[in-house]
Design a protein with these regions (language model features):
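A structural boundary/capping signal
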Residues: 1-140
Length: 140
């Protein structure tokens, strides 16, 4: 199936079935027509398998502390920072692509993570932890 058709099918489907990792790699495949999207998805699987602690903090420690992912402070606006395959290769990216890596590694570990858009930033939150905190606040 054509990359554009595959992307269109993905975003037309139910929201809860719209996988961010697949969408990001399909976008990257437009820049690199030889990109094997399924191979790229397996790279995220491998990152998840290497994570010893299945928590948001554990994923962040693994990706940023052990594997060496970091923000690209030298050439922040370069388009390669928006291509998930290149971010995996370089272990450098912008907040939104790094957040996609965190969320998708977390999803593979059974975590319920979500992206949070902020002015000039993109953050990741653990839905379970926030829900538990909100419940405690209501009970106290």
């Amino acid at each position: 199936m054509d990359i554009t058709d595959r992307f269109a099918d993905l975003v037309r489907g139910p929201e809860d079935e719209c996988r961010i990792d697949l969408g990001a790699f399909l976008i990257a495949a437009h820049a690199n027509r030889g990109l094997d999207v399924d191979d790229q998805l397996h790279r995220l699987d491998d990152l998840a398998m290497g994570c010893p602690t299945p928590t948001l903090d554990g994923v962040c420690e693994h990706l940023f502390g052990v594997v060496g992912f970091q923000g690209d402070t030298e050439d922040y606006k370069h388009p390669r920072n928006s291509l998930l395959d290149v971010v995996l290769d370089r272990r450098r990216g912008i907040p939104i692509t790094l957040a996609v890596v965190v969320m998708e590694v977390g999803r593979r570990l059974g975590l319920d993570l979500a992206g949070v858009g902020m002015p000039g930033h993109f953050l990741v939150r653990d839905r379970d932890r926030i829900a538990a905190t909100a419940m405690r606040a209501k009970l106290n």
